[in-house]
Each structure stands twice: as structure tokens, then as C-alpha cells.
Amino acid sequence: MNTMTLTPGQLSLSQLYDIWRHPVQLRLDASAIDGINASVACVNDIVAEGRTAYGINTGFGLLAQTRIADEDLQNLQRSLVLSHAAGVGDPLDDAMVRLIMVLKINSLARGFSGIRLSVIEALIALVNAGVYPLIPAKGSVGASGDLAPLAHLSLTLLGEGKARWQGEWLPAQTALKKAGLEPVALAAKEGLALLNGTQASTAFALRGLFEAQELFASAVVCGALTTEAVLGSRRPFDARIHAARGQQGQIDVARLFRHLLTDTSAIAESHHHCHKVQDPYSLRCQPQVMGACLTQLRQTKEVLLAEANAVSDNPLVFADAGEVISGGNFHAEPVAMVADNLALAIAEIGALSERRIALMMDKHMSQLPPFLVKNGGVNSGFMIAQVTAAALASENKALAHPHSVDSLPTSANQEDHVSMAPAAGRRLWEMAANTRGIIAVEWLAACQGIDLREGLTSSPLLEQARQTLRERVAHYTQDRFFAPDIECATALLAQGALQRLVPDFM
């Protein structure tokens, strides 16, 4: 199991990926402790001095003007968690819950939240013991933070709700006991600190980014394979073309294609007396389209990495000045906007792949047998596989509709503009699955196309990509049950079978 020392505010993208993919043993770096304790001392001083501060000794939202008596402060925080745990939908899987929990720990441990070290350590203990709170997927609008999902997370700390331990759903109290843990009682400010934040939105979008990176790399490899299958030109990837435009994403994608499409292969040699002048856009413009997608991936990485290390609580405790200040760091608009842009990129990656599949089906464009199979008529070949790809590409066009432009007022109009970041991030998962299915069909089709170029082979890297598939999926000599082959190729893509052939591009 991976062991990680958490220095608050310094998580890397590779660490976040590892947390999502694998269970982790966390340890909080000792450098964080003084800041955590100072923020708690500041909260305690406010209570002791009888000062009024939002979230410490007041109600919440529209009830912020209601002063809460000192003897009710602990009950205030518990009631907040219970009342806000109002999510609906299927439970998030363990990987997503783990990522949300670590993001929450990372934010709280920055020392601006007024939450005791013991509560942060209780969250760390949940992660280390593999106790995963039941968090419904839906119910947050991404401002004031992800209240419902984080309330469900926090229920387990109190011994309320349900949690999964060793694959079994249990009452939280039972799960804690089996893991050797105890519930905690929350002090002033702590319930609000746990609930306020963009951690669910950020985790949702991070998963979308991780999947988009795999899809991008796989699509570049399959795009290169298709270029070979239809004997497309290498000339559009010439570095001079892309340097003249100056778009960095485009320049870098063209470099990836040159890495994959070497000049020393049988297919490359076949171009020496080629009569073609220009290829269709789905081949020729791959650097331009995929370069624009890469730019969106990089922008998403920048914003999400900042948000993963951010303090998105409210109010914030500035212990050095003895102040508690209300603001709006809980508003997940940055996450929503990059998730929307990432959705466009995922949709375009899939759309371009589908067009290349369609190109291979057309004997006039590809100079290959219709639908990539001999004895057409008796055999239908890839005819309906392309239809499946078209259906998935069409679904993604609807799913790519932006969420950040939508807003519904909540909390009696106190919270009158919200981000819809959770929905913006969550739909990326379905889009990624759709695009992976499209790329799987292209991989199958491109390898079939190269097979049909009898005697011609591609570059070493692309032959490796073809061999990886052929070890699991045979060449099509006649029609057979097609769906298992798509499923197999899809599973290989999800395992990173093609991603490892592409140098780091982020």
C-alpha cells in the first residue's frame, strides 16, 4: 500500500492520481501542526471574548444573523452535519470517496479553518483504515461548497449514516468499531469547516482529467494507426507547418505524431510515389484539433491542481491577526468552467476518432475493402461498429452542454448564484466512457486496415500497438460476435495499453 506524507497545499497531480487509483496510508507532516493549533486558538478566543463570528456562534446561510448561545455551540455543529446530509443518487465508489477525503484533509490542514488536529487526524484514520463514508453522487450545486456530499462524509466521523469497510456497507458506528476507531464530537466552527469546500467538485473533475489524459494519448496512437491504414501522408505533421502558427498544443501534438510515424517503415516507403495531394481533415488536421484539446487538458490541470491545494472553507481564520473573515472561496466556478472546457475536449477527441472510423469504412476514401472485410455482402464487417461509434459521439455532443452558465438561487436567495460544478465534473465520466468506446472501435478498425495492406508494416511503436491488440483480438476474416472485441479493446485502453507508447505531454 502506498504511504504518503501530506504537506498541506503541496499535492502533485501524480500524487492525486495515485490516491484515486490506490488505497493510501497518510501521515500529516509535522510542519502543519502549529498553524492548525493557532487557528483553533483564534476560534476559542472569539468564543471566550463573546465576539460574534459567522459559523462559530451564528446560524448559517439566511440564518447568519441568529446568535447562538455558548452552551449550544457543539449541538449547532452536529445539527449542521445532520441537516445538510441530504444527498441523493447512487453512492460514490471507494476511489472517489478516498480522493474527496484526502482533498478535505489537505485543505483543513492548511490552518485557516479553525478545526482541531484531532478531527483532522480522525479523517486521516478513516482513509488509513479504508472506512469509506456513503456519499450520494447528487445534491450539490457547487456553492456554498459541496455541502451535501461533505455532510455525508462527515456523518461517519460522528458515527452516523453508513460507511463501507472491506467492501461491506455497515452502519457507520459499526464500521468505526470494526476498524478500531471512535466517533468524534465537533467543537465550534468544525462542522462548517468540514462541510464548506469544493472538494467533491474538484475530485469529480480530477477523475475526468485523469481519464481525458488516457483518452488523449490513446486517440493520438489510434489516429496514427488510421493514418497508416489509409496510407495517409506524413507531411501534415512537418514541424515547420506548426511552428508557423505558433500554437503550442498543436506544435506538441505534431511532435507526438512524428514520434509515432517514423520514416523508416514499409508503409512510409510506399509513399515515395504517392499520387495523393491532400488527405481529408480528419487525418490532416489532427495536430490542430488534438492540439486545441491538449491546451484544454493543460488548462484544466493548472486550475484543478490549484483548487486541490486550496483553502475553500468559509469563513477563514487568520490567526496571526486574530480575525475571522467571511468570503466566497467555496464558490466552485473555476472548477465548473474548466470541467466544461474539458467536456468539449473529450467530445472532440471522440468526434474526430469517429470521423476517422467512417473514413476507413468508405472504400473510395480509404482504398480498402468496404467495411474492412473481404467478401462483403455475405460479411458486414465493421458496418455497425461504426454506427455504435456515431451513437456515442452524438451522445457526447449533448453531454458537452456547459453547466457553468446555469444557476439556480438557493437558501432563500442568500446563495443567489451557484456554479453547478459537481454536475459539470460528474458528466465527464460518462463522456469518457463513450469516447473510450469510440477509440476502441478505431483501434480495432485501424489494425484491421493495416492487416489488409498485406506485406506493409508500420513503425515499431505502431506495430507494438497492433500487436497488443492482436494478442487478444484476432483479425476478421469473416463476421463474428462483435461486442466482445469492443469490450476487450475498451478494457485494454482503460488499463493504459496505448498511453504508455506516448511520451509525457502534460
Swiss-Prot record:
GO molecular function term, any single one: histidine ammonia-lyase activity
Subcellular location(s) per record: Cytoplasm
Keywords of the record: Cytoplasm, Histidine metabolism, Lyase
One annotated Gene Ontology cellular component of this protein: cytoplasm
Gene3D superfamilies (alphabetical): Fumarase/aspartase (Central domain), Fumarase/aspartase (N-terminal domain)
EC number: 4.3.1.3
Catalytically driven reaction(s): L-histidine = trans-urocanate + NH4(+)
Associated pathway: Amino-acid degradation; L-histidine degradation into L-glutamate; N-formimidoyl-L-glutamate from L-histidine: step 1/3
Pfam families, per the entry: Lyase_aromatic
Keyword Aminoacyl-tRNA synthetase: no
Post-translational modification: Contains an active site 4-methylidene-imidazol-5-one (MIO), which is formed autocatalytically by cyclization and dehydration of residues Ala-Ser-Gly.
SUPFAM superfamilies linked to this entry: L-aspartase-like
Cross-link (5-imidazolinone (Ala-Gly)): 143-145
Disulfide bridge positions per record: none
Chief location of this protein within or outside the cell: cytoplasm
Biological process per Gene Ontology, one example term: L-histidine catabolic process to glutamate and formate
Family matches, as CDD domains: PAL-HAL
Modified residues annotated as 2,3-didehydroalanine (Ser) in this record: 144
Similarity comment text for this entry: Belongs to the PAL/histidase family.
Protein's name according to its UniProt entry: Histidine ammonia-lyase
Organism: Salmonella paratyphi B (strain ATCC BAA-1250 / SPB7)
